[in-house]
Amino acid sequence: MKLTQFAPSKILVAMMLVAAPLAWVTLRAQQQAPALSALDYVEIGQLANRYAHAIDTCSNNGYDYADLYTADGTFTDYVTDEGYAKKGLVRARGREELARAAGGGTLGCKNVGWNGWSHLMLNHVIPPAPGGARGRVYLVTIGSKGPNSVERFGGYEDFYVKTAQGWRIQSRTHVRNKAWHNPLLQSPDLN
């Protein structure tokens, strides 16, 4: 059988049958999140540790806290009654607002509402995601209801990106206990 006996439409169909699966595999690979290295996990985990120290101490007038975020980073409230009712309320965006959110910046660390508290970040889960990584971590506070009190105070849901300065928080949402997205993980609202 000569090649000239095949109709051009049959050749085109055969080529499409070969090309379509290859295109699908390529597209699927592009949509999946890249793997994170062990160093990525350590550096992202350090953000949670540095966050707790920066917020507890208002170090560097709140700018140590702000510098854990990207330049356009956001902190969203989904823990207060107002934030919960609005399904999230951006409380701070960008370095200056984030420094003030930590009690610093123009506020000068004078009346930090959580003075005497210790923020503990526990059970940090960091799955890779397109463009960076997601994070989910419980927040437990010591001292929020008086000396030696211990309370789960919801948690944080984050999106991290790798910048020239290393991993940074692009967005952090403080979520109250009953608002965690998996109903099996929801606990009575203590906030």
In which residue ranges do the predicted regions lie?
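Bacterial N-terminal signal peptides that target proteins for export
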Residues: 2-15
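Bacterial N-terminal signal peptides
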Residues: 13-23
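Short, low-complexity N-terminal intrinsically disordered segments enriched in polar/charged residues
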Residues: 27-67, 71
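A beta-strand edge to alpha-helix "cap/lid" segment located at domain peripheries
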Residues: 30-35, 109-191
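Short beta-strand segments enriched in hydrophobic/aromatic residues
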Residues: 55, 69-70, 77, 139-141, ...
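A solvent-exposed, acidic/Ser-Thr-rich amphipathic alpha-helical stretch
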Residues: 61-62, 66-138
